[in-house]
Each structure stands twice: as C-alpha cells, then as structure tokens.
Curated annotation (Swiss-Prot):
Optimum temperature is greater than 95 degrees Celsius for hydrogenase activity. Stable up to 100 degrees Celsius. Loses 50% of activity at 80 degrees Celsius after 21 hour incubation. GO terms for molecular function: ferredoxin hydrogenase activity; hydrogen dehydrogenase (NADP+) activity; nickel cation binding. The gene is hydA. Optimum pH is 8 for hydrogenase activity at >95 degrees Celsius. This is Sulfhydrogenase 1 subunit alpha. It comes from Pyrococcus furiosus (strain ATCC 43587 / DSM 3638 / JCM 8422 / Vc1). It comes from the Archaea. InterPro entries: Ni-dep_hyd_lsu, Ni-dep_hyd_lsu_Ni_BS, NiFe-Hase_large, sulfhyd_HydA. SUPFAM superfamilies: HydB/Nqo4-like.
Length: 428
C-alpha cells in the first residue's frame, strides 16, 4: 500500500523579524521531512558596496537591519579600521560598546516580552496581553526605550547610528547626559532582575533537549563582552576570527534563500545561551549571582534556555554599561575623533550581536571596498534551528496539527531569528 503523507505548513512564522515558514511532512510512521523555508529574497548588500568609497559603504551596511543596525554599524566600522590599520582609543572603544549595549537591551527586551511571552500566556499577540499583563508590557517598553535612547544619544539617531564614524564619533554628548545615562541604567536594573525571575519560571521544553555545539566570540580582556579577536567553541576549540572560513562552512539548501552553516560538518548554535556557555566565567555583579543560582536552567542542551540567557544579559549589560561609562568619564573631556588614513588592507571583525556572532570581512583598495563578506547570527543558526523543529515535530506529530504548529513556532522564536539579515550574496 502506498504511504500517505500529510504536510503541515506554516506559511509565515509570526512574531519574528522577516519572512519565513515551516513545512513538516508526516508519513505513516512519523516525520519524513522538516524544512525551515526562508522566503526573504536576497538583498545583495555585499555586492552593492563593491566599488563604493569606504565611508559610503559604512553608511549602507546598517541598513541591513533596523533591529540590530548598531551591531552592523559597529562591526563594519571595526572591520574597516582593521583593514586600514587604525586602532581607536580605549575611551572611544568604551563608548562604542555602550552604544552596542543599547542595541542589546532594546533587542532582548522586545524579543522576550513582545515575541516570546505571549506564547507562555496563551496570547497570539502582545497587544492582547495589555489588560491582564500591564506591568510586563510597561517593563518591556521601559527597557526597550532605554536601549533606544542610549543609541540615540551616542549614535545621534535610534537606528543606523550615523554618528559612529571612522576614527571615533562625529560628536559626543555633554558629560551631564552621560551621567544621566548612568542614572537611568541604575533605575532599570530592578526591572532587568524582575525580567530574569519571570523568565526563569517559564518551561524549557524537554522535547528538544540534546547535545548542541555553541560558538561565541571570546571577549577581549577579563569581562564578558561584545568584541573579540577569537571565536570559541564549546568543544574546546578556539580560532582567530580571520580564519572563520576555515572552520565554518556555508552551503546552499534548495528550500531556502538563506544558506545554512556547519562547524566541523555539523549544525551549531550562536546567541545569548552560547555566550553564557562559553564565557560565563567572565560575568560579574548581579548577573554572576543570578547565573550561579540558576545554572541548571542555563543549560547548553536546550534552545529554550536562550530566552533566559537573554534575560540574564539584560542584567549584565546594564551593569557593564555603567562601568564603561565610568571608564570614559574618568578621561573626560574626550576628543570625539582621530584622523584615519585610508590605506589598502583587509580586516575581519567578529562581534556579538544580540542574536549571536556577526562577521564582517572587508577589503579596501584605493579607498574603496573591493570585497565584502557578512555572515549574520541567523545564517549560522538556521541548520540547528531546523534540527530542533524536527525534534519537536517527532514528539508531537500525532497531536492536533494546530498544537504542533504553535510548538514549532516557539522553537524558532527561541532563537530570536532575524530573517532579513540571514540572506546574503557575496558575488553577483
């Protein structure tokens, strides 16, 4: 007798950035195939910057994404500065990291409260939660607005941050504004701690429990952070950022406009939980206390732990931003910018965007970009994400199809994908 196949299709995954769907094919004896369909068209950001002046290209790259434009701006800037042989002063680097932290706080708060929490409270939209969960929505918006304000102050706008330029910043705010930023961060710390306690109570579905290889940037210095020159894997491997192509292989899959990535021939994960797994020993302050008390919930074997790891990071990055502001203010007044000589060269920057490792590789010749390669966290995560959707489907394929759809979407949302970022073409 011929086997019968039942397709379960999610045409559009709700509450994620970009356009993607899931297709689960179920046969007589279980799940036959799972496809994470990325239907966002390639956007050619690398290709369109070839031949552009370096400064012009640096204004284009943040347009890849409004969710994480600061991450794109600052990673591209570092790659460009490495290419031309320029090293920014410590106080400039500290303020750039504060700008980046604004992106972290905004992105994590939006993801946790507005994209993830509705699933756990039985709502299809955060707007429908307002009456019953007014406090949670208010906290979400306060944290989100704090991150947005930080980016606006240091980047001169909430998205695309044109004030971050080669050599430093176009201008810097008054000292009193940065002092106010410290005060606002201190006021937000209890909200971040509440967020962690809230998400520590949410279920991490055991259906997707299993071994995961985690990759994260190894931070410079002795603090858990965003910038680094090496990539660290949970299998003990470390390699220089410049050798990312030797260890991480991208490949085309038929059902997706975004390529998949493997490390040592296998899917892997990046993101907040990957940072915690690889770099938890560098946490400090209240975040360190929360981590030590909740290690069993911050496991590297479950993608749902990524939600709690993001909540932990909101606590940590608030404290870290205060410390970085203190470092910069100790050297006040600060010259905003140094002159940069545009020389020929090649530079690679790996930073930790909210969703995981972000890679920029830029080659500069005669003041123009001659090569660009950008790999985003979601492009790294797609293969592992698809594997976890399969694991969930294998446990629930006999359930009501609508229930399976919800669980499959929850798996995807746990990764906090930015689908628009994940499609890229290096050469036309």
């Amino acid at each position: 007798m011929k086997n019968l196949y039942l397709p379960i299709t999610i045409d559009h995954i709700a509450r994620v950035e970009g356009k993607g769907g899931v297709e689960i094919i179920i046969g007589d004896d279980g799940v036959k195939e799972v496809k994470l369909n990325i239907i966002e068209g390639p956007r050619f950001f690398e290709a369109i910057t070839i031949g552009k002046k370096l400064e012009e290209a640096l204004a284009i790259y943040p347009r890849i994404c409004s969710f994480c434009s600061a991450a794109h701006k600052l990673t591209a800037l570092e790659a460009a500065e490495k290419a031309v042989g320029f090293v920014p002063r410590e106080e400039i680097q500290a303020l750039r990291e504060v700008l980046y932290i604004g992106d972290m706080i905004e992105s994590h708060a939006l993801h946790l409260y507005l994209l993830v929490l509705p699933d756990y409270r039985g709502y299809s939209s955060p707007l429908k939660m307002v009456n019953e969960y007014k406090r949670e929505i208010e906290i979400a918006l306060k944290l989100k607005n704090l991150g947005t304000w930080m980016m606006d102050i240091l980047g001169s706008r909430a998205i695309h941050q044109e004030n971050a330029v080669l050599g430093g910043f176009g201008k810097l705010p008054e000292k009193s504004v940065l002092e106010k930023m410290k005060a606002e961060l201190r006021e937000a710390l209890p909200l971040a701690e509440y967020t962690f306690e809230l998400f520590a109570k949410l279920e991490q579905y055991s259906e997707v429990e299993g071994p995961i290889t985690h990759l994260a940037v190894k931070p410079r210095g002795d603090a858990y952070g965003i910038y680094g020159d090496y990539i660290k894997a949970s299998d003990g491997e470390e390699f220089p950022s410049e050798k990312y192509r030797d260890y991480i292989k991208e490949f085309v899959v038929e059902h997706s406009f975004a390529k998949h990535s493997h490390y040592k021939g296998r899917p892997f994960m990046v993101g907040a939980i990957s940072r915690v797994i690889n770099n938890a020993d560098l946490l400090y302050g209240k975040a360190k206390e929360l981590y030590e008390a909740n290690k069993d919930l911050l496991k590297g074997t479950n993608p749902f732990a990524n939600n709690l790891a993001q909540a932990l990071e909101i606590v940590y990055f608030i404290e870290r931003a205060i410390d970085l502001l203190d470092e910069a203010l100790a050297k006040w007044p600060i010259k905003p910018r140094d002159e940069v000589e545009i020389k020929d060269g090649f530079g690679v920057s790996t930073t930790e965007a909210p969703r995981g490792i972000l890679v920029y590789a830029l080659k500069v010749e005669n003041g123009r970009v001659s090569y660009a390669d950008i790999i985003t966290p979601t492009a790294f995560n797609l293969a592992m994400m698809e594997e976890h959707v399969r694991m969930m489907a294998e446990k629930h394929y006999n359930d009501d199809p609508e229930r399976l759809k919800i669980l499959a979407e929850m798996v995807v949302r746990a990764y906090d994908p930015c689908i628009s970022c994940s499609v890229h073409v290096v050469r036309l």
